[in-house]
Amino acid sequence: MADHNGVDRSITAKAMRRDFGELHAVDGVDLEIPGGRIFGFLGPNGAGKSTLVKILTTILNPTAGRATVAGYDVQKQGGKVREAIGVALQDVGLDPLMTARELLMLQSELFGTPRDKARTMAERLLKTVGLDDVDPKKRAGAYSGGMKRRLDLALALVHDPRILFLDEPTSGLDPASRAAIWEEVRRLNDELGMTIFLTTQYLEEADRLADEIAIIDKGRIVAQGTPSDLKREVGDEVVELQFGSCEDAASADDALSAVAPNRQAGGRELRLYFGRAAENVPELVRALDGAGIRLQGLTIEQPSLDDVFLRVTGEALEHKVDAPPPGDDKRAEVTS
């Protein structure tokens, strides 16, 4: 759907499927993303995130289904799609013998930008992604993993795309670099109306940036909505109970099944979801006392995206915003 300037920045997918042998990496996904949104796409490793991005960016063909990007069919009009999008994937592909400025200028000139403007653009983009103070003679092959990711993002922005696909763009970056990327993503969306499709394993990143979020698990969308709506569906408040051992937590999970049917156990903790948590605390304590289970701590808090993720996938998303995750293994590259 076109915006008021007649520019289509939307993304749609209908009954999208991609198989790898007997593995359904993407299994019947439907999406409708209006232009001008930041769309967060979450899921465990191997859930289908990167596979769907590769379909939408014309890198992979779907086994079945249909998708459009910027109004163009990804299978029938792949060239038009590629003209309209910028892409920064997990698998960074840079010429190791070229410098950052050479790569940016080459990319810019390939899109028809005059050389003097290409040079100015290269400097601006290097500053944007925090690489402007790197030795200009340093070749991309000598860059660290985080530096390569930042350069890849800069390359994706060279032609001012309508839609930007970012596949875990801040993975492996330090907190300061991550914050700079967040600021640039928000600026691109606020000032240019750019649609941004963001896959991430950082829940705080999705919560801060995304207008809407979808969670994929085993190739299927299991939850979708605004961050606040998804958290509201979990419950208005969360009671977290802490115990001295995993065995005590497991016993408490059984003892509280009738009192708190909506709950999640993990290690020595038990999280229970209520409309009004404080009103239920006395009954929880009585039930634990009656079962002879010693409680070591109790807190009441608002639900987070961690709670949403845990509820719909049955597992926690371990990567936190201040602890960059390790590199993905080869299996994750194919199906994540």
Model-predicted regions and their roles:
Residues 164-167:
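Catalytic Walker B motif of ABC-type/P-loop ATPase nucleotide-binding domains
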Residues 139-143:
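Conserved ABC ATPase signature
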Residues 183-275, 299:
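ABC transporter nucleotide-binding domain
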